[in-house]
């Protein structure tokens, strides 16, 4: 009767295999994390597009919307269903609460009300953007600058770009320079 022999891995072979696996995982993890962030940027763009579409529809019907309560307006009129309140937020930013002010920021204007009556091209007018309240580190309902007591700013959280919704209904990922060229407040973070 033949004697069965079993081949065992040597310690060296096991360590070499383990080191190869660790090196490959170290190479792949940053790529996977980058892919996850790109997916969040795309989801943010979709959420902003939905919010922007509701805002433009509301403005087209009622001619004016308050910068202080635009989210309440969209929810109350059903332009954004209560079940889809998360579409008013960027998924890349961790929420500490779910208040109506923890959302995309609307451009702050004199009188706190927006209309469709602007000078210039609607494709150059920023209406919504990724926002941040510098005092609380939360998204905020509007933005205009970091001067005085007001620290409500555009936040460049997507690889040094902010998603911005324009009055023509388009949403683009834009750098600080691009938004400044569009007349967006220069007070940014």
PLM feature segments, named:
Residues 37-189:
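Short, well-structured segments within or immediately adjacent to enzyme catalytic domains
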Residues 5-36:
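N-terminal single-pass transmembrane signal-anchor helix
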Residues 1-3:
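Short, Lys/Arg-enriched N-terminal segments with co-localized hydrophobic residues
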């Amino acid at each position: 009767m033949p004697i069965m022999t079993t081949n065992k891995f040597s310690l060296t072979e096991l360590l070499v295999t383990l080191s190869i696996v660790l090196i490959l995982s170290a190479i792949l993890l940053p790529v996977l994390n980058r892919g996850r962030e790109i997916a969040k940027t795309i989801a943010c763009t979709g959420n902003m597009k939905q919010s922007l579409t509701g805002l433009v529809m509301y403005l087209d019907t009622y001619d004016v919307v308050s910068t202080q309560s635009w989210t309440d307006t969209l929810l109350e009129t059903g332009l954004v269903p209560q079940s889809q309140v998360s579409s008013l937020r960027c998924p890349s930013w961790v929420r500490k609460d779910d208040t109506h002010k923890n959302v995309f920021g609307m451009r702050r204007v004199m009188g706190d009300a927006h209309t469709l009556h602007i000078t210039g091209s609607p494709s150059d007018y920023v209406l919504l953007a990724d926002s941040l309240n510098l005092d609380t580190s939360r998204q905020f309902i509007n933005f205009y600058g970091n001067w005085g007591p007001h620290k409500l700013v555009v936040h460049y959280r997507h690889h040094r770009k902010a998603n911005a919704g324009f009055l023509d209904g388009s949403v683009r990922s834009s750098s600080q320079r691009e938004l400044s060229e569009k007349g967006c407040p220069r007070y940014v973070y």
